[in-house]
């Protein structure tokens, strides 16, 4: 496995903060838009028309679904529950299962080249190490292993004391790699987990399925603020991202979407809309 600093260290990093932006190229800044943006940036990084990217994004109440979630036997009941609780639903184009987003959850996309020579595990490990470095002054107890009972469980769940606060997914476009992580920073993590648990209850109704959906236990989830005993905000964590990135690059630049990126974004946005219409 490659050293994580070798994977992330680049002379120049492009920094994009979409956390408070209301629209992107004329499209409302929703989670659907975010996945199209990351695909666009992965293409640019792959074609070397952009340096590697760190992008920050935050969305109001959204349940991001995986493709298996869209195949629940009673998905209409699950979707109705989501809407009744004032969440919108988006089916993502990367791996994983349902995740709850709101203003207390910071999403970070690390978009780098190397799709042909970096393994999936190399990239997951690099993100784990990056997050550990971000909070090294507060804790050395961030671990990566599957937290049974969490939503969107996986080998690279991030937890403190056995309670999960983050999950990682990954998507590859050409030679570009987008490693995405959600960080539960502040707010009611228990309520987020309850919504996901009830979504599965409504969508499955105890029916036997060939796919194993998680049996969500809100007690195994937590926010960073709660787990660290520090009143962290999303803004605080954004500053930590930049501070850590400064140690891994010679310069950080902010570049708006270029002409070709706008073209690619519109194409990828249409694909995301179509994906969500067909699910």
From Swiss-Prot:
Catalytic function, reaction form: N(6)-octanoyl-L-lysyl-[glycine-cleavage complex H protein] + L-lysyl-[lipoyl-carrier protein] = N(6)-octanoyl-L-lysyl-[lipoyl-carrier protein] + L-lysyl-[glycine-cleavage complex H protein]
Gene3D superfamilies linked to this entry: Bira Bifunctional Protein, Domain 2
EC number annotated for this UniProt entry: 2.3.1.204
Domain BPL/LPL catalytic: 48-253
Pathway assignment: Protein modification; protein lipoylation via endogenous pathway; protein N(6)-(lipoyl)lysine from octanoyl-[acyl-carrier-protein]
Catalytic residues as annotated in Swiss-Prot or TrEMBL: 152 (acyl-thioester intermediate)
Gene Ontology terms for molecular function: lipoyl(octanoyl) transferase activity
Keyword Acyltransferase: yes
Top-tier EC class: transferase
Keywords: Acyltransferase, Transferase
Database matches in PROSITE patterns: BPL_LPL_CATALYTIC
Keyword Transferase among UniProt keywords: yes
Any GO BP: lipoate biosynthetic process
UniProt-annotated site: Lowers pKa of active site Cys, residues: 164
Function: Catalyzes the amidotransfer (transamidation) of the octanoyl moiety from octanoyl-GcvH to the lipoyl domain of the E2 subunit of lipoate-dependent enzymes.
Protein family membership: Belongs to the octanoyltransferase LipL family.
PANTHER family associated with the record: OCTANOYL-[GCVH]:PROTEIN N-OCTANOYLTRANSFERASE (PTHR43679:SF2), OCTANOYLTRANSFERASE LIPM-RELATED (PTHR43679)
More about this protein: The reaction proceeds via a thioester-linked acyl-enzyme intermediate.
Protein name, as recorded: Octanoyl-[GcvH]:protein N-octanoyltransferase
Taxonomic source organism: Oceanobacillus iheyensis (strain DSM 14371 / CIP 107618 / JCM 11309 / KCTC 3954 / HTE831)
């Amino acid at each position: 496995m490659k050293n994580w600093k070798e994977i992330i260290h680049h002379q120049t990093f492009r920094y994009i903060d979409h956390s408070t932006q209301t629209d992107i190229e004329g499209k409302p800044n929703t989670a659907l838009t975010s996945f199209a943006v990351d695909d666009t940036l992965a293409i640019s990084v792959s074609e070397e028309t952009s340096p590697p990217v760190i992008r920050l994004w935050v969305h109001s109440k959204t349940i991001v679904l995986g493709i298996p979630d869209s195949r629940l036997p009673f998905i209409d009941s699950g979707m109705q529950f989501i809407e009744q609780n004032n969440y919108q639903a988006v089916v993502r184009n990367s791996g994983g299962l349902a995740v709850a987003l709101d203003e207390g959850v910071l999403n970070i996309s690390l978009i780098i080249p190397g799709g042909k020579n970096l393994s999936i595990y190399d990239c997951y490990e690099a993100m784990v190490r990056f997050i550990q470095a971000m909070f090294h002054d507060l804790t050395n107890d961030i671990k990566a292993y599957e937290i049974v009972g969490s939503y969107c469980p996986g080998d690279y769940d991030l937890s403190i004391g056995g309670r999960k606060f983050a999950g990682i997914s990954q998507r590859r476009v050409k030679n570009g790699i987008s490693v995405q992580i959600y960080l539960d920073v502040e707010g009611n993590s228990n309520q987020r987990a309850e919504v996901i648990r009830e979504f599965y209850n409504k969508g499955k109704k105890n029916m036997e399925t060939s796919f194993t959906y998680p049996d969500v236990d809100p007690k195994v989830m937590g926010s960073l603020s709660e787990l660290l005993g520090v009143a962290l905000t999303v803004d605080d964590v954004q500053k930590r991202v930049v501070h850590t990135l400064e140690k891994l690059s010679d310069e950080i630049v902010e570049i708006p979407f270029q002409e070709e990126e706008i073209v690619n974004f519109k194409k990828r946005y249409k694909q995301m809309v179509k994906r969500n219409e067909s699910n």
